[in-house]
Amino acid sequence: MHITNLGLHQVSFQSGDSYKGAEETGKHKGVSVISYQRVKNGERNKGIEALNRLYLQNQTSLTGKSLLFARDRAEVFYEAIKLAGGDTSKIKAMMERLDTYKLGEVNKRHINELNKVISEEIRAQLGIKNKKELQTKIKQIFTDYLNNKNWGPVNKNISHHGKNYGFQLTPASHMKIGNKNIFVKEYNGKGICCASTRESDHIANMWLSKVVDDEGKEIFSGIRHGVISAYGLKKNSSERAVAARNKAEELVSAALYSRPELLSQALSGKTVDLKIVSTSLLTPTSLTGGEESMLKDQVNALKGLNSKRGEPTKLLIRNSDGLLKEVSVNLKVVTFNFGVNELALKMGLGWRNVDKLNDESICSLLGDNFLKNGVIGGWAAEAIEKNPPCKNDVIYLANQIKEIINKKLQKNDNGEPYKLSQRMTLLAYTIGAVPCWNCKSGKDRTGMQDAEIKREIIRKHETGQFSQLNSKLSSEEKRLFSTILMNSGNMEIQEMNTGVPGNKVMKKLPLSSLELSYSERIGDSKIWNMVKGYSSFV
C-alpha cells in the first residue's frame, strides 16, 4: 500500500522516536520532509487520496502536540512547587527554554530532559527522599491535572464506498438522563484517567462506543473501559475489593444506559433482563505488572453481581431529577480473558490462568457441548429463538469461535492478534447482550480492539458477511482500517488519559519475530508511526 497525494506535496513530519521509520527525503531542524507521488485517475485512487488527505490533516494537528505536552507538563509542576512554597526558578527556566522551540521540534529527548528536571526539583523543593515516594508524587500531581480536565463526547465520521459512518464515543461523565449523570458518585463533567490506580468510586477511562450508519441507525454499541481493579491499593485488601465492587456496579449501570429502553423500564419500576459479555485483554502473569491480580479483582466483582435465581440485582441510578432510584435487574454476566500482547501471542504466557475461566464462560454463552459437537445452546440459542433473523450471523461467528478455540489459534498472532476477542464481542452484540471490553488502561489494547470491531462492523454492513477466519486484509480493507485508526476517536481518548495521543500497541522490538502483525495489517509505515504517535513519551 502506498499513500499518495494529488500533485506533489512536501510536508513537515514529526521526527524523533515517535515517528521513527518514516521515509525521509530531506531534513530541517527537528522535522523530516516526506514526498508523495502523483496519482491521477481511478476509483481505487479516490480511496487512496481520501486516506492521504486524512493523513495530512492528522499530521498537521499532531505536529505541535509534543510541544504543548511539554509546556503543560512543565507548568503543572511549576504550579505544584509554587503552591508548596518552593523555589520555582529551575522549572521556570525550563518553561522559558520550551518557549523558544517551534512546533514539531520537541522529541523524546527533550521530554526526558524535562522529566529529569521535574524529578530533581520535586525531590529538592518538596523534601522527598524516597525514590518510590518521589515517583508516586510526580505521577499523582500529573494525574490530578488530567482528572481535572473536562471530558466531553468524541464524535468522528468517515466515508467508505459512498456511505457515511459515525463513531460516537460518550465518556462516563456524559452518561446522563437529561442533564443528570446516572451514577451514584458524580463525575461533574471530568474524567478518570488510566493513571488513577487508587480510584475507588469510578472505573478509569470508561466510554460508550457506538457506530451508526448514514441514516443514524446504530449498527454496534458496547462499553470500553480500564480494568475493574484499584490496583494501586493493597492486594487482597477489603478496601480494594470494595473499590472493585463499586467499579463493577458502575459498569453494569453503563451497560443499562447503553440500552435506553431497558433503562427507562427499570426506572419505571419494572425488573429488566440484562446480559453482559465482558472480554478482558489482559495477560495475567507475574511479568505484566500485576495483571493476574487485576483480572481476579475484575472477575470476582462482576460474578458477584450476577443475579441469583429469583433475586434480581439491585442498582442505584440517578433519574432525570437527579434523584437516586433503586432499579431491579435480572443480571447475567459472563467473563472472558484473551491476551493480545507479545507476551501472550509470541511467548505463550498468561493462558494457563484463564483457560478454565474461558471454558466456563463458553458453556454459558454457547452451550455445554458446543466445543465438542457444535450444537449451539446457552445464550446464543435463546437469542436465536427470540430473534430468528440473527440465526445465520450467530452460527457463522459461533463456528469461527469454535475453530479458533479448538485449534488454539487465539494463542498466536497469525496475522490477526484480536481474532477471538473481536469475534466474541461481535457475537455478544449480535445476540443482544451488551459487549464490554478492557485492558489495564482502557486506551491501547482496548483502543485497538475498538478499531478492529469498527472495521469489521463496516465490512459486515456493506457486504452482509463477517470476514472469513485466517483471511488477510485486502489493500482496500487496509485503507479502511488505517482510516479508522486515524479517525475513530482513539487518539483523542489516548490524549485525555496521558496528555498526548499515541498507541503503545505499536512497538518495534529488537527481535522482529516477537512483534505483532500490525505493520502488515496497516500496510504503510507512515500510518503505523502516526498511530504509534507520542506513546513513547509516557
UniProtKB/Swiss-Prot annotation:
It catalyses: a 1,2-diacyl-sn-glycero-3-phospho-(1D-myo-inositol-4,5-bisphosphate) + H2O = a 1,2-diacyl-sn-glycero-3-phospho-(1D-myo-inositol-5-phosphate) + phosphate. The keyword Protein biosynthesis does not apply. Its main location: secreted. GO terms for molecular function: phosphatidylinositol-4,5-bisphosphate 4-phosphatase activity. A motif (CX5R motif) lies at residues 439-445. It comes from the Bacteria. One of its GO terms (cellular component) is extracellular region. Keywords: Hydrolase, Plasmid, Secreted, Virulence. The active site is at C439. Converts phosphatidylinositol 4,5-bisphosphate (PtdIns 4,5-P2) to PtdIns 5-P. IpgD is injected by Shigella into the host cell and is required for invasion. The accumulation of PtdIns 5-P causes membrane ruffling and actin cytoskeleton rearrangements at the entry site. Belongs to the phosphatase IpgD/SopB family. Contains the consensus sequence Cys-X(5)-Arg characteristic of Mg-independent phosphatases. It comes from Shigella sonnei. NCBIfam families: PRK15378.1. Coiled coil: none annotated. This is Inositol phosphate phosphatase IpgD.
